[in-house]
Amino acid sequence: MTARELDAYFRSFLNFGPFVSCDVALNGLQVANSGAPVHKVAFAVDACAQSIDAAARAGARMLFVHHGLFWGRIEPLTGMQYRRVQALLTHDIALYAVHLPLDAHPQYGNNAGLAARVGLRQGGPFGFIRGTAVGLWGTVAENTTPSQEAMQQHAACTAPDTHRVTHANAISPSAGLSLQQVVHRLFPAEEQPVRLLPFGKQRIERVGILSGKAGTYLAEAIALDLDLFITGEIEHSCYHTAREHSISVIAGGHYQTETVGLQLVARKLQRDTGIETLFLDIPTGM
């Protein structure tokens, strides 16, 4: 497939439309290649010198990222930006970026992937940006394991509306998880959250998830009477706000919470097209 054909493929399911007015990122093909067929696609969180160099060493002809190079304004190709674009052109690598549509996708998105990890039963949309929901909230319980919920999400491929209306009140009020149980489910590969604010209930049921930098959405979590807010990165002011409203917060890391959707899309691409994929893990610790 060419880069243009891959652009059409990604657009066929990632649903850019709702985010045209609320996403400052340029979603889609940001830098083309020469038109040569793409037999390998590298996936990374950030378009940066490290990811471009790693993609080149791996022989990839496309780099698919969550954080691209262009963010809603005209940027001169000088300095760092010039070097990045020059490296892409030198190695004939197309750059493809998907920001909010990748966070929000109900099956292949960052938030859906995190929800599957913790075994979330979805209650409704959460994290509205100019009227468009990017995150989700729901409930967790000991009798809903991550693997069971992941299977439900897989089955939802042909019935996404059914998945969306699996309501929280289906779970017994006595069920719930401890904060450490949620952390263990969220980071099964021995990763660690950047910050925990353990100010909520001992047994957690109502959970909101919004990947990346979303500390400002703590107020929305409080308004929904959630027990736990899971995000990537928070502001200093979140500490006292969470403490005084008795809500726990997991700041899982901006990077760590945004690796999930990329890997889901990579698996789908390889399954659908046979194109080889690889994930470039370049953690920032943030």
From Swiss-Prot:
A divalent metal cation 1 binds at residues 66, 103, 258. The keyword Iron-sulfur does not apply. Disulfide bonds: none annotated. InterPro entries: DUF34/NIF3, DUF34/NIF3_sf. Pfam families: DUF34_NIF3 (PF01784). It comes from Treponema pallidum (strain Nichols). It comes from the Bacteria. Homohexamer. Keywords: Metal-binding. GO terms for cellular component: cytoplasm. GO terms for molecular function: metal ion binding. Belongs to the GTP cyclohydrolase I type 2/NIF3 family. A divalent metal cation 2 binds at residues 67, 254, 258. This is GTP cyclohydrolase 1 type 2 homolog. Transmembrane segments: none annotated. The keyword Metal-binding applies.
